[in-house]
Amino acid sequence: RIVTATTDARMIAVDKNTGQPCSDFGEEGQISLLAGMGEVKPYYYFVTSPPTLASGVLVVGGWVMDNQETNEPSGVVRAYDPRTGELAWAWDMGREGDTSLPPQGETYTRGTPNVWSLTAADDELGLVYVPTGNATPDYFGGHRTEIMDKYASSIVAIDAKTGLTRWHFQTTHHDIWDYDVPSQPTLVDITLDGALRKVVIVPTKRGEIFMLDRVTGEPLTEVSERPVPQTDLPNERSSATQPFSTGMPSFAHPRIREQDLIGITPFDQMACRTAFHQLRYEGPMTPPSVQGTLLYPGPAGGMNWGSVAVDEQRQLLVINNLHLPWQIKMIPREEDIARNEAQDARRGYGIGGPQRGTPFAARVELFGSPFFLPCLKPPYG
């Protein structure tokens, strides 16, 4: 049979020869993925990646609309019987150890990091590897609980039989940059120090690539915690350090200098240089600010959906990397309300959003000229 998930939060099974719904799967060949989710506003939850068949169950995550509010649908990961469509387990980080459907009147934990990208499975080890995003919304985290931060922007190995966590590795601490782990984890066997190791390679939006033992989650190349710039937003916090994959090549790009900026006319080049000096920018991981922050790599990467390719025979890793800086401006709630009341939609939020339930909205857009061209010299990827 062929099983697929949809953008209206269903999973459908059809006969691979006839295309007819499999009548023994759910109700006439389909199940709803909204069970246990509670209130789901239109377009706030759907599936963007196919289910993964892992040790006899179908594992599926879901996409949650970015940057709307704190109380968005859960980022729960679920597994289903591929023949009947019955729930096998649910990995809900707010109910660790409880893999069942929530009781009547309750829901999976709302606002938790979701898994919108592709997952990967090792049937021999009985593990499914899920790349996580961060708790909603993306650019402010003062409200986040310890458990929301624990599994955010991480690679998590889940026991495919039980739905329990075996290990996890975090690529960004207290992520306030939308640095989700965006790519399918790549599972390969690599010879290291004369021994064949089972490896999972984790590409990131940050341009850092982490190589981990896929049995234990232990880094197989050096990872260093380095100091990073700190937030100046009230009621926010930021991690004093962030993990850098110093034992692997980094594609996080050099720090941008003024001479790296371009324009097709003197006018837009001057506009780019003026904006560059007005934005807060202290290199990688500069936190969002009311002043406006230059973020490079931006929330599109670095690396994104495409993951990496591996030539196992020659032990070569091939990547596709993006070179585009973005700018993030945090808008105090009172100012955002005034803008909305005045119906000032001249710029909107870009790919940011109102972030209701926090003190700030966020406007996030490409660091570009008034002619909508990148301010940074090419190449762009």
Model region roles, listed by residue range:
Residues 1-10, 15-381:
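A fold-level detector for beta-propeller and closely related beta-sheet-rich head/sensor domains
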